[in-house]
From Swiss-Prot:
It catalyses: (1R,2R)-1,2-dihydrobenzene-1,2-diol + NADP(+) = catechol + NADPH + H(+); D-xylose + NADP(+) = D-xylono-1,5-lactone + NADPH + H(+). The record marks D176 as: May play an important role for the adaptation of the alcohol substrate into the binding site. Strongly inhibited by isoascorbic acid, 4-hydroxyacetophenone and chloromercuriphenylsulphonate. Stimulated by various salts. Homodimer. The keyword Oxidoreductase applies. The gene is DHDH. One of its GO terms (molecular function) is trans-1,2-dihydrobenzene-1,2-diol dehydrogenase activity. The record marks Y180 as: May play an important role in catalytic activity. The record marks Y71, H79, K97 as: May play an important role in coenzyme binding. One of its GO terms (biological process) is D-xylose catabolic process. This is Trans-1,2-dihydrobenzene-1,2-diol dehydrogenase.
Amino acid sequence: MALRWGIVSAGLISSDFTTVLRLLPRSEHQVVAVAARDLSRAKEFARKHDIPKAYGSYEELAKDPNVEVAYIGTQHPQHKATVLLCLAAGKAVLCEKPMGVNAAEVREMVAEARSRGLFLMEAIWTRFFPAVEALRSVLAQETLGDLRVVQANFGKSIANVPRSVDWAQAGGSLLDLGIYCLQFISMVYGGQKPEKISAVGRRYETGVDDTVSVLLQYPGGVQGSFTCSITSQLSNTVSVSGTKGMAQILDPCWCPTELVVKGEHKEFPLPSAPGEEFNYTNGMGMCYEAKHVRECLKKGLKESPMITLAESELLADILEEVRKAIGVTFPQDKC
């Protein structure tokens, strides 16, 4: 049976995800509805992607009995309201990262999903790329020896993108880019809570975080560090170092196709998407998380074992603590 998707928001990321779903077997994935706050935008999106139903409100999509799982592609501050709306209507939910602007928002969504017995997952698509799966295998086999250090950085000059510097929309480098670095560190150290967090950063003129460097100490004295920036191009790589060697995820680390282990270079090409254009780098890689959601739902799971709800809460806790350390608060923090 095909998993029936409803797409919440007709923006660029939703377009890429819908393109991917269209390219997957129709016996496994079907997009049955799209909703935008403007009906004309929803209809235009539906025409482009051959979607049978277009709604001018998120409420209408949530009420559609044909929708099994909702993909939330709204702006950061709208995630909580749209996730809660879809959960209240009995839908499974895949929510774009960051799941919430702060830890309280994430906890509220997680509590709602658990109380209703519904599936909820934060769409950290990076976790599902074959290059990252290969890295996990390397770690499981202890190829690198005892792990000591994880270093990651992700920076692009995107201050010209209005959303990236919009304080009201919870822009800035941490929630947009830093979360990718942090999730790598968290993955390597098994979702443990860091014992110590320190951070330095500069703010952009709009009040969002511009460039931030974070140092995390974990149990056993092992470390993780990352730098993220919306005004500077960084190397956009991840390195994991142990007593027997190093592994590197190469640029683009957030959607990687290359892994170097102790100097041995391995490539993991994306599935082909002939004739399709994506808004974001390696957009076809969203197929891996889509397939994962279907597998989880087929098994009757309420959360993903690859990115648990507890880990989503932990990531939100750390990101919020870092923001506080550098003096960045958003309107949602005062609620």
